[in-house]
């Protein structure tokens, strides 16, 4: 609502000798019913209100409000038996020095994205800060004997270099926050993202990851930088997916 175009043009049409007409996606005759339904499946929450309903709404409150502990989680005994063989495995990392470091063990079979395990080290709570070498040791132990791709926040240059020396295949994450949140929200809303109940920190963050209301009042859109470490790691993975996964 605080976007300059809305403030200057939408709310003051007479000032510019302009006419404001509100259109929804259903008013676009060039879009087929199939295309409209695809977009309606793609967007959730505030993004649905904006891109489908055409509303100027603020991003506020819980970001992943569409997350359901009933529909977006699974118990360990519900894990598909052939998951490891029928899925591509990736470890997504949000690296911190004073902030927590999180690893997410992700299995993707092309239809469902399963976050099966998580690693957490909070140097403040543990009163002990780990080195890049120690984190690399932990990641290799977390990975186990079967190697896989590791996606890491690009700002963690020294950690990426340490993993490279260990022979780990590292991909620098796409750290686009707004687009990553939009994509992640869509996959959560369509129940494509499934989280094992043992990943308690990631599940907790689904309810505590919130928009920054003060930034919204300035016309900016960004999340509060706290309780976001597992959510960031998940976003890094989602940003690595091809566009067709969001259709």
Feature map (PLM): residue ranges:
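ASCE P-loop NTPase helicase motor core
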Residues: 1-42
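A polyampholytic, Gly/Pro-enriched intrinsically disordered region
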Residues: 15-16, 39-51, 190-203
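Conserved beta-strand scaffold positions in the cores of enzyme catalytic domains, especially
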Residues: 18-22, 90, 170
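A residue-level signal for conserved active-site and pocket-lining positions in enzyme catalytic cores
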Residues: 23, 52, 94, 103, ...
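ATPase catalytic-site recognition across NTP-hydrolyzing enzymes
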Residues: 28-93
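Gly/Thr-rich phosphate-binding beta-strand-loop-beta motif of the actin/hexokinase/Hsp70
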Residues: 84-108
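Mg2+-dependent endonuclease catalytic cores in nucleic-acid-processing enzymes, primarily RNase H-like
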Residues: 104, 110-225, 242-245
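Stable alpha-helical structural segments in soluble proteins, enriched in small hydrophobic residues
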Residues: 229-240
């Amino acid at each position: 609502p605080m976007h300059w175009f809305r403030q200057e043009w939408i709310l003051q049409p007479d000032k510019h000798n302009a006419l404001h007409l509100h259109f929804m996606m259903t008013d676009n005759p060039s879009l087929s019913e199939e295309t409209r339904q695809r977009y309606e499946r793609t967007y959730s929450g505030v993004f649905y209100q904006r891109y489908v309903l055409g509303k100027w709404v603020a991003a506020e409150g819980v970001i992943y409000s569409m997350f359901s502990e009933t529909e977006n989680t699974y118990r360990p005994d519900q894990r598909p038996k052939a998951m490891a063989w029928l899925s591509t495995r990736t470890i997504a990392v949000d690296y911190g020095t004073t902030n927590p470091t999180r690893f997410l063990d992700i299995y993707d079979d092309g239809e469902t994205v399963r976050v099966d395990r998580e690693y957490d080290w909070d140097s403040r709570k543990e009163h002990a800060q780990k080195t890049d070498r120690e984190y690399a040791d932990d990641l290799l132990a977390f990975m186990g004997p079967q190697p896989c791709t590791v996606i890491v926040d690009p700002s963690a240059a020294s950690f990426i270099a340490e993993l490279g020396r260990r022979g780990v295949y590292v991909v620098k994450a796409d750290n686009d926050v707004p687009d990553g949140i939009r994509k992640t929200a869509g996959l959560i809303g369509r129940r494509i993202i499934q989280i094992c109940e043992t990943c308690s920190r990631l599940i907790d963050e689904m309810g505590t990851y919130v928009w920054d209301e003060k930034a919204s009042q300035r016309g900016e859109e960004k999340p509060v930088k706290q309780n976001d470490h597992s959510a960031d790691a998940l976003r890094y993975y989602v940003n690595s997916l091809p566009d067709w996964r969001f259709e």
